[in-house]
Amino acid sequence: MNQDPTQQLEPFLKRFLASLDLLYTQPTSQPFPNVESYATQLGSNLKRSSAIIVNGQPIIPSPQEDCKLQFQKKWLQTPLSSHQLTSYDGHLIPGTGTFVVHFSAKVRFDQSGRNRLGESADLFQENNSIVSKTNQRPIWGSWFGVDVNLVVDENVMQDGEIINSMDYRFTYVPNDSIIKV
């Protein structure tokens, strides 16, 4: 009996979204040795030569930095996020070894005023506060709607750089959010 080749897409998509939501300081696991090693894990499935579009704006590679690195740098500056996959559709393109995947998700952002590294724009940082930076909880805002189109290599069960193209687009922005996209 033939198995549906798209069956392996859902676990892959969940792993990819989890890579976009990584915490710099994980309370349950070994912390990252430095910011660079953390940043390289954000969207780690993207190929260095990936075509990346965010909200209709393409990320243009420079001679010094590829699209993946530029995306990771921009994503590092955003607040902490939490993605939730809502639906997906994928089609294997015969003879090419690639899937075309379209999925919808919800994402919410931390509205506490800190970026992914816990940095804020406060002029005076309280060094000896009762609550340390690692124990500060995110203040989640309302859910945004996201629509993503991917072109991925057929071997989606292997971790590695397998995303050839990504179009990440916000389809719903809540009125009560302080985050502007």
Swiss-Prot record:
One of its GO terms (cellular component) is nucleus. The keyword Nucleus applies. SUPFAM superfamilies: NTF2-like (SSF54427). Pfam families: Mtr2. Gene3D superfamilies: 3.10.450.50. It is found in: Nucleus. Keywords: Nucleus, Transport. It comes from the Eukaryota. Affects mRNA transport from the nucleus to the cytoplasm. Interacts with MEX67. This is mRNA transport regulator MTR2. It comes from Candida albicans (Yeast).
